[in-house]
A protein has these predicted regions:
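A cross-kingdom feature marking solvent-exposed beta-strand/loop segments within repeated
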Residues: 58-68, 87-88, 95-97
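Sequence/structural segment immediately N-terminal to covalent heme-attachment motifs in c-type
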Residues: 29-57, 64-82
Length: 145
């Protein structure tokens, strides 16, 4: 595939509107939100920033992403488990890579992290459960050692 095609696909996917079944974000006092916030600060905020805004042309904004709060969290789970390679841009000719966290986070931690991301910065989405993460991890055959 040509680079222009890859960039067009990436742009399209980033612009898909959210399809959330939740009507209001979880409270910041919710235990899963607190646990997820701590993990986010430790592992994600350096690139995606505390406000979820990311860094233009380098690290995507989670706050502006419709797919973050989509009804089905499997794509988001996959990215966090396996990491992702960004397309090349003029600002980053090699294209930054998000590391895989599947080896580092257990199912409960990953569920808390994604629940936090899906309910922050104006998003309102159903919480991600340990079972959903476990099933996705199994389907993706990610080694946890």
């Amino acid at each position: 595939m040509k680079q222009d095609d890859l960039e067009a696909i990436a742009t399209y996917l980033k612009d898909i509107p959210a399809e959330s079944a939740a009507t209001a974000p979880l409270s910041a006092d919710d235990p899963s939100m607190q646990a997820g916030a701590a993990i986010y600060r430790d592992l994600c905020a350096a690139c995606h920033k505390l406000d979820g805004a990311g860094v233009a042309a380098l690290f995507p904004s989670l706050a502006a992403s419709g797919s973050v709060a989509s009804r089905e969290p499997t794509s988001l789970i996959r990215v966090v488990l396996r990491g992702a390679q960004s397309v090349s841009t003029s600002a980053a000719p090699i294209g930054p890579r998000m590391p895989a966290f599947g080896w580092q986070l257990n199912d409960a931690e990953l569920a808390a992290l994604l629940t936090y991301i899906r309910n922050s910065w104006g998003h309102a989405a159903m919480p991600v459960t340990e079972r959903t993460v476990r099933n996705a991890r199994s389907r993706l055959a990610v080694r946890n050692d």
